[in-house]
Amino acid sequence: MLKKRIIPCLDVKDGRVVKGVNFVNLTDVGDPVDAARAYYEAGCDELVFLDITATSDNRETTVDMVRHVADQVFIPFTVGGGIRSVDDMNKMLKAGADKVAVNSSAIANPQLIKDCAEKFGSQCVVVAIDARKEADDSWHVYVAGGRKDTGIDLLAWVKEAVQLGAGEILLTSMDKDGTKSGFDLDMLNAVAQLADIPIIASGGAGNMEHMVEIFEKTPATGALAASIFHYGEVSIADTKKAMKEHGIEVR
C-alpha cells in the first residue's frame, strides 16, 4: 500500500508565496525558497508550487525559482501554472522539478497529457483539476484560477485524463478552498472510483483531524494544505503523529 503523503502547497504570484480564500483576496506569506526549505526541514513528504500568475512574461522567474528550490530541497516537488507545451514541461523538469502539473492547458488541449506522458513518463505528469458542485449535484471543472466554468463534468474529465496518461490527479474542491471546514470527501470518493492512479486531495484542510479523516474515509494518497501550515496553526510533525496514532502509514 502506498504510504500517505503530507504536502504543503505554495501558491506563487510574482515570485512570492500567497494565500487567499476561494481563490481571491490574496495575501503575501513569504519567499518560496525559504518556505520550501522550512517545510523540507519540518519533514513534509512532497511540495507543490502553483504559479498562479504564470504567463509567458514570468516564465523565467518560475524556472529560476525551481532551480533554487531544487538546490535546497531533497524531496519530490511538483510545479504547475502556465504549462502549455511539452517544451514548458521540459524546462521545469530540467530545472529540477520531479513532476509538472497541467490544468487549463490540458482542458484546452487534452493531447498535451498524452504528449508529455509519452515523452517524460506518466510519473511526471500531474493533472490538476479545480472543481465545484453544481445545482444538479454534479461537479464541473473550472479554469482560469477557478473563475471560469468549462461546463465539463468532473468525472468524465478524470476518466479521459487517466486514459491519456496522467500519472496523478491533484483534485481541488473550490467549494472548500480556504474554508478550513474539511476536505470534500464525496467528491474524492467519486473520483477515486474512476482513477486507479494516486489522488492528492486539496481544499478545506483546517486541522489535523481533517488530515486523518481524508485518509480514513477516502483512498486519497496525499493531502495538500496551505493556510494551516503557512500560518503555523498545525505542524507537519504533529500531523504525522496523529496519523500514526490512527494506524495510517506515513513516510
UniProtKB/Swiss-Prot annotation:
Protein name stated in the entry: Imidazole glycerol phosphate synthase subunit HisF
Subunit (UniProt): Heterodimer of HisH and HisF.
GO molecular function: imidazoleglycerol-phosphate synthase activity; lyase activity
Pathway: Amino-acid biosynthesis; L-histidine biosynthesis; L-histidine from 5-phospho-alpha-D-ribose 1-diphosphate: step 5/9
Family to which this protein belongs: Belongs to the HisA/HisF family.
Keywords of this entry: Amino-acid biosynthesis, Cytoplasm, Histidine biosynthesis, Lyase
Primary role: IGPS catalyzes the conversion of PRFAR and glutamine to IGP, AICAR and glutamate. The HisF subunit catalyzes the cyclization activity that produces IGP and AICAR from PRFAR using the ammonia provided by the HisH subunit.
Stored InterPro entries: Aldolase_TIM (IPR013785), His_biosynth (IPR006062), HisF (IPR004651), IGPS_HisA/HisF (IPR050064), RibuloseP-bd_barrel (IPR011060)
Main location: cytoplasm
Residues the record marks as active site: D11, D130
Organism (species): Streptococcus mutans serotype c (strain ATCC 700610 / UA159)
EC number: 4.3.2.10
GO cellular component terms, semicolon-separated: cytoplasm
Subcellular location: Cytoplasm
Any one GO biological process: L-histidine biosynthetic process
Reactions that this protein is recorded to catalyse: 5-[(5-phospho-1-deoxy-D-ribulos-1-ylimino)methylamino]-1-(5-phospho-beta-D-ribosyl)imidazole-4-carboxamide + L-glutamine = D-erythro-1-(imidazol-4-yl)glycerol 3-phosphate + 5-amino-1-(5-phospho-beta-D-ribosyl)imidazole-4-carboxamide + L-glutamate + H(+)
Pfam families (alphabetical): His_biosynth
